[in-house]
Amino acid sequence: MAADLDFFFDPVCPWAWITSRWVVNVSEQRNYEIEWRFISLWMLNENNTREWYTPQYRAGPYLGHQGLRIGDAIRLGEDDPTAVGRWYTAIGEALHVGAQREAARGDAVSWYRGLLVGAGLDEGYLDAADDESHDEYIRADTELALSRTGKDVGTPILTFHPGSDNEASFFGPVISKAPRGAEAVELWDAVEKLATMSGMAEIKRSNRIAPDFT
């Protein structure tokens, strides 16, 4: 069965996490299917030579990329179509809500092992964290996402109605706090209308408040 929405995520991005919680809330109310797909910030920045992109900073995107490798192993190894989404939820709850970024960077292997166990997933998937054979699929998903939106964006990228005549993709929405209930559905309807409107290219502002994970 085709998904109603493709959601391309990198697990270390706090903005993608907030958007994903909004999407999950709406899916529970509207009963639509999400396919959780990959976009790697580590790959997007692999040729980044800017001063601020230090080895210490690079450790964050690489942590996310390891999570995507494990996610790809889960995609291949599990019959449950919700398994990748459960994996993303486990990472996001710990990393963003639980503020475990420093612990994750300090010992990524142990940290990811604990998340696999907590999510009821095979601990053997941990071997994928440093397995470059998963990079081909992750890169293909990353390139697919950017082919739908253009290359000057990040994560999340959403595709409404993938594979249909009215398929539409965009970067975002970037929101500081995930709405719930009726407010979440109202935002969904507005965003879907904008995304699928012929000729719609961009709506944006750069002012943001700090992310709120509650």
Positions of the model-derived regions?
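Local sequence-structure signature of Cys/Sec-based thiol-disulfide redox active-site neighborhoods
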Residues: M1-N25
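A short alpha-helix capping/helix-coil boundary motif
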Residues: A2-A3, T89-E93, F170-F171
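Residue-level signal for beta-strand positions within conserved beta-sheet cores that form or flank
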Residues: M1, R30-Y32, N166
